[in-house]
Structures are given as C-alpha cells and as structure tokens.
Amino acid sequence: MTFEEAMNRLNEIVERLERGNVGLEESLALFEEGLKLHRFCSEKLKELELKLVEVQEDEAGEVTFEEIVEMEDDLPF
C-alpha cells in the first residue's frame, strides 16, 4: 500500500465515522483500521524525513533542518 492509498482510505474512514450512520461493531472495526493506517502513514513520513536529513547533510557532516521544519507545517494532519 502506498502512502497516498493509506491516506485516502483513512479519509474515507473518518468521513464514515463522522456521518455516524454505522453500527457500534463496524465503528470499532473502522476505528482499529484507522489506527493501523495512521501508524503506517506516520512511519512513512518518518522514513521520508530521515531521507531528507541524509540528502541535506553537507560535506562537513552538518545537517540543516530548515526544510524539514517548513515541510512539517504543511502536513494535512
């Protein structure tokens, strides 16, 4: 599953739960699936952040975090 697929499914789950027209058991199942998707997306973002840090490391081994901080402000969650 890609990050985008996981985010789309997570958005679908949130919409269904917000509508409130699902039973208790289905709500619990959707909530559990949503938690798993959230963990998956968080891990993918952490992996991306590590790659960005590696890319931004200069010749002296210094790492600049400016770009990462700016990117975090634009995240949709």
Curated annotation (Swiss-Prot):
Q: What Enzyme Commission number(s) apply to this enzyme?
A: 3.1.11.6
**A Pfam family reported for this protein in Swiss-Prot or TrEMBL:** Exonuc_VII_S
The entry's localization annotation reads: Cytoplasm
Q: Name one GO molecular function term.
A: exodeoxyribonuclease VII activity
SUPFAM superfamilies under this entry? XseB-like (SSF116842)
Organism domain of life: Bacteria
Name the reaction it catalyses. Answer: Exonucleolytic cleavage in either 5'- to 3'- or 3'- to 5'-direction to yield nucleoside 5'-phosphates
Provide the alphabetized UniProt keywords. Cytoplasm, Exonuclease, Hydrolase, Nuclease
Q: Where is it mostly found?
A: cytoplasm
Q: Name one GO biological process term.
A: DNA catabolic process
Q: What class of enzyme is it?
A: hydrolase
Q: Return the GO cellular component terms, semicolon-separated.
A: cytosol; exodeoxyribonuclease VII complex
Q: Does the keyword Nuclease apply?
A: yes
Q: Which InterPro entries match?
A: Exonuc_VII_S, Exonuc_VII_ssu_sf
Which NCBIfam families does the entry mention?
Answer: xseB
Regarding protein family, the annotation reads: Belongs to the XseB family.
User: Subunit notes for this chain?
Assistant: Heterooligomer composed of large and small subunits.
| Record-linked PANTHER family | EXODEOXYRIBONUCLEASE 7 SMALL SUBUNIT (PTHR34137:SF1)
Report the function annotation for this chain.
Answer: Bidirectionally degrades single-stranded DNA into large acid-insoluble oligonucleotides, which are then degraded further into small acid-soluble oligonucleotides.
Q: What is this protein called?
A: Exodeoxyribonuclease 7 small subunit
**Source organism (scientific name):** Carboxydothermus hydrogenoformans (strain ATCC BAA-161 / DSM 6008 / Z-2901)
- Output the lineage of the source organism: Bacteria, Bacillati, Bacillota, Clostridia, Thermoanaerobacterales
What is this protein's gene name? xseB
